[in-house]
Amino acid sequence: MSKEDVIEMQGTVLESLPNAMFEVELESGQKILAHISGKLRMNFIRILPGDKVTVELSPYDLTRGRITWRAK
């Protein structure tokens, strides 16, 4: 899957789940499961419930995503 195929959306972290998974509510109101991208994991970026994040969604499965940015 190339970078052009992903869908970027904004959302809020609702809950932290095991194995670095998070429940995220998108601005559209949809709830998805998301994991942390490699760069955030390598740099030990902490993500807590209530944080605003940018999520990349695959066009093939819109219920799962990857957190690529945490807003300040």
Curated annotation (Swiss-Prot):
It comes from the Bacteria. CDD domains: S1_IF1. Pfam families: eIF-1a. GO terms for molecular function: ribosome binding; rRNA binding; translation initiation factor activity. The keyword Cytoplasm applies. It is found in: Cytoplasm. Residues 1-72 form the S1-like domain. One of the essential components for the initiation of protein synthesis. Stabilizes the binding of IF-2 and IF-3 on the 30S subunit to which N-formylmethionyl-tRNA(fMet) subsequently binds. Helps modulate mRNA selection, yielding the 30S pre-initiation complex (PIC). Upon addition of the 50S ribosomal subunit IF-1, IF-2 and IF-3 are released leaving the mature 70S translation initiation complex. Component of the 30S ribosomal translation pre-initiation complex which assembles on the 30S ribosome in the order IF-2 and IF-3, IF-1 and N-formylmethionyl-tRNA(fMet); mRNA recruitment can occur at any time during PIC assembly. Belongs to the IF-1 family. This is Translation initiation factor IF-1. The lineage of its organism: Bacteria, Bacillati, Bacillota, Clostridia, Eubacteriales.
